[in-house]
């Protein structure tokens, strides 16, 4: 990646992406060549959803609580279901599978003081004054399919997996801290979806990133540590993933997407687990999942290309009869 990222065109790129995707509210901040540029509603806080996981992992590490068990929980290798601390089905045992429940268990190390620990260990030392768990008065509210405004409330016990509000400016500052420190959190623990997962971060060929999606919000924090580049993008729409994808592509910051060879006929079928479902047929994937906070069903369809592309498609088939769709290992159910 060259340093000639079109930083001066950031506002234009974001406006164009909003027009193409019909997303009403978005904010983007880009730090490159020692300078941060902003676009959109960058002074207002959005819910950052699962980007919170990096803050949780960072706090656990800084508190000296990072043992083997919590390392497994924070890397999604503990074998838990998406929202319950129960074992995955036998067909999926031993596979990497995304779990909010694992993050809640890891945060239990703070014995009920998780929110205070994140504030004292991470937010205050970094000067992140616009980041926190309580809904700010000037918060942007999320919108669900049908342009329904999402309820901003969020259960306290769910906070470790996705509860923070933040601005793109604060996220860039947080990202820059990770560009220069905490390398132990960036060491890959498991391989999945054409990339590697560390502790609260995806690792792909020199890039670190994490996406977020909950309650009508879509978000991304993307870093290139060796070049001290940080990009934060926040949106208030379920269509926000498309906007963020366009912005990343237009800035020339998209990590390479890895694919693996496969036989289409061998993976066609229906896969399900705990409300997550995927139908693989005719060279495409149709996935559906419940929003973990609102319960709203979300559906998307994309070409069958095992691996992942940032903010778009993500699927692989780690063993016969199992698909990892949308980051969750799902057993096949139509045999």
Question: What would you call each of these model-derived segments?
Answer:
Residues 32-35, 68-225:
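Short, surface-exposed loop or secondary-structure junction motifs
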Residues 46-49, 96:
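Catalytic tyrosine of NAD(P)H-dependent dehydrogenase/reductases that use a Tyr as the general acid/base
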Residues 246-335:
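Peripheral terminal and inter-domain segments
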Residues 12-45, 59, 71, 75, ...:
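A short, well-structured edge-of-sheet supersecondary motif
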Residues 1-9, 333-335:
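Actinobacteria-biased recognition of intrinsically disordered, low-complexity terminal regions
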Residues 52-56:
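Active/ligand-binding-proximal structured segments within catalytic/core domains
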Residues 37, 220-237:
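Short, well-ordered beta-strand elements
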Residues 7-15, 119, 268:
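Short amphipathic alpha-helical segments
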